[in-house]
Curated annotation (Swiss-Prot):
One Gene Ontology term, aspect cellular component: plasma membrane
Coiled-coil region(s): none
Top-rank taxon, per record: Bacteria
Transmembrane segments: none
PANTHER family attached to this UniProt entry: ATP SYNTHASE DELTA CHAIN (PTHR11910)
Family: Belongs to the ATPase delta chain family.
Protein known as: ATP synthase subunit delta
Gene3D superfamilies on file: N-terminal domain of the delta subunit of the F1F0-ATP synthase (1.10.520.20)
Purpose: F(1)F(0) ATP synthase produces ATP from ADP in the presence of a proton or sodium gradient. F-type ATPases consist of two structural domains, F(1) containing the extramembraneous catalytic core and F(0) containing the membrane proton channel, linked together by a central stalk and a peripheral stalk. During catalysis, ATP synthesis in the catalytic domain of F(1) is coupled via a rotary mechanism of the central stalk subunits to proton translocation.
InterPro entries with a match to the protein in the record: ATP_synth_OSCP/delta_N_sf, ATPase_OSCP/dsu
Cross-referenced Pfam families: OSCP (PF00213)
Length: 179
């Protein structure tokens, strides 16, 4: 949803600026953990309850994560700001945008690889190596299996899609034959 992304962006950018002064990986872990907690309907219910104070919500969120960064004043201020502005539900989007900023800084990108068959370690390593050469950046792959592809893979890196699946080739042939 574009609106959520627009609202979440300043929070992600502000948190990233704070993280640049310390350990970006640790902050990334914290924001990912907070996003997981914020996805729980029970947490959102408690956070929106008039019977629970904002301070209690902040303490609940910080207690629910394992990251050592959560003990710091910056983390508490960040969560307090989200609670005060009723933005807890934005944490998953904030985490996503924080990861994008982190990847951009590292010259990396997330790669979603969908394969018709499970990829073993050597095959995946070879595929990722070739994709890194093609996209000219370090890739962080996530792999899914979708047998409807029939064969081949579909790779999504940012807004670029590389589809070498048999299903895509058949669709291309069908379009060419019916045109």
């Amino acid at each position: 949803m574009a609106e959520l992304a627009t609202i979440a962006r300043p929070y992600a950018e502000a948190l990233f600026r704070v993280a640049e002064g310390g350990d970006i990986a640790a902050w990334s872990t914290l924001v990912q953990e907070l996003a997981q907690v914020a996805r729980l309907p029970e947490v959102l219910s408690v956070a929106s309850s008039p019977k629970v104070t904002r301070t209690q919500v902040v303490e609940l969120l910080l207690a629910a994560v394992k990251s050592p960064v959560a003990a710091g004043a910056e983390a508490k201020n960040f969560v307090q700001m989200l609670v005060d502005n009723h933005r807890i539900a934005l944490l998953p989007e904030i985490a996503e945008q924080f990861e994008a900023l982190k990847n951009e800084r590292e010259g990396a990108a997330d790669a979603e690889i969908v394969s018709a068959f499970p990829l073993n370690g050597a095959d995946l390593e070879s595929l990722v190596s070739g994709l890194e050469r093609k996209f000219k950046r370090k890739l962080k792959p996530t792999v899914e299996v979708d047998s409807s592809l029939i064969g081949g893979v579909r790779v999504t890196v940012g807004d670029e899609v590389l589809d070498t699946s048999v299903r895509a080739r058949l669709a291309s042939m069908q379009a060419a034959l019916t045109a």
